[in-house]
Amino acid sequence: MKLVIAEKPSVAMSLAAVLGATERKDGYLEGSGYLVSWCVGHLLELAQPEAYKEQYAKWRYEDLPILPENWKYEVPKDKKTQLALLCRLMKDKRVDSVVCATDAGREGELIFRLVYEYAGCNKPMERLWISSMEDAAIREGFDHLRPGSDYDKLYDAAVCRAGADWLIGINATRLFSVLYGVTLNVGRVMSPTLALLVQRESDIESFISKPFYVPEITCGGFTASGEKMTERSEAEKIRMDCDHNSAFVRSVEKQVKTIQPPRLYDLTTLQRECNRIYGYTAQQTLDYVQSLYEKKLATYPRTDSQYLTKDMQATAASLILWLRDNMPFGKGCAGEPDIDRVTDDSKVTDHHAIIPTVEIARTDLTELPSGERDVLTLLAVRLLCATTQAHRFETVTAMLDCQGHTFTAKGKTILQSGWKEVERIHRMSIRQSETEHRENEDAALPVLKEGQTFETVSASLREGKTSPPKHYT
């Protein structure tokens, strides 16, 4: 009999349903040769300093640094019952092997291994490593369980990360708190991140906005701009020189440019995009996509890859076709899907990019919580964008001369909307303002030729102020 240990109850229930372990027991499920139980997050945590020496209970400068030779762990009071159950199940004579089915990542490995070692278990250990909670993916994963030893280095990395956090957090927090007489929390990741925020805030507060002036001429239905100036008098002189005088086109440069489709989402890029579009925090996005994963609607979220593996191409192709036919933004796609563009086995380590699963075709999205619906929709949009045509446009840069002064006019003509059409339809569906996407875009220019003359131009002065750095989002 195999003992399967998941990271949380909801995942255990999904695994048990596929495995046929349907008989409910106190803290686990049983059936078809399986016992399926769960952790509740971390059941063991690194002990506080006083667990090593009683004198460390008091924060004193002379005790620093605190450097344990061997790590000690403690069990949170609210998790003792579940830990005791798992220890008992591991020692159950019916169990001949244990399957680590915690999240397929560094922290999931740590959660399971600490329990396995705490229980003193020496039964064979296997690893379930899947990127989707779909039934088919679960079956495939259990058909190809991997030796637990394959992930020893992943466990070592998790222990190192936890230890580094403890050493820096405990010692630096105590040091600065003692020196300054007030509790100052210091963390390995938190403190440098906070330093970036403080520096940016300082830059914003100390920023002194300065005015600038740009002489412009309007001729033939378009506007050309001169050099940005800090002295109004200089800009005004140019305006007066040019107003109601003639101008001619000195040069016209045309260039066709291509913007390739974006890559699929890894967790970081998904969090960044959800913050930009919806204002969700990184934690909110992670919570939403984790819930989608557990509902079998999205693949594993904690990934740093933006590519798929070759064995996913057939599934991805059918999913893309369904999205094109059934989602409003799907009509923005053109041409055959280019799945090869998002496929690269060499760029996938533990998990592939985050995409929807085929379960989306059997789900009423209106029944999902709004945050989950937003994230799932964004995953679908990105999958279509990444596999449709490139965005192509022609830029035109015209240099004009008016009374010896140089002016520049820029324009852009869309040749092929490509993936940006999918994005545009999605933006309209969520009523996102088009202004923020078009404010930096150039309108199309009329046809211009070198030497072309405009007999009378209208000159004006555009005023503005320099802007401070933006806050981080």
What are the language-model segments listed below?
Residues 1-162, 166, 437, 442-444, ...:
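Intrinsically disordered, low-complexity regulatory segments
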Residues 9-10, 39-41, 103-109, 130-133, ...:
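An acidic- and aromatic-residue-enriched active-site/binding cleft used to recognize and process polar
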Residues 11, 107-111, 156, 160, ...:
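Hydrophobic (often cysteine-bearing) scaffold residues that line and stabilize catalytic clefts
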Residues 23-27, 148-153, 174-178, 202-207, ...:
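Active-site phosphate-binding and catalytic loops of NTP-dependent enzymes
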Residues 35, 43-77, 88, 181-290, ...:
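Long, highly charged, low-complexity internal segments
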Residues 280-348:
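Extended, well-ordered alpha-helical scaffold/bundle regions in very large, multi-domain proteins
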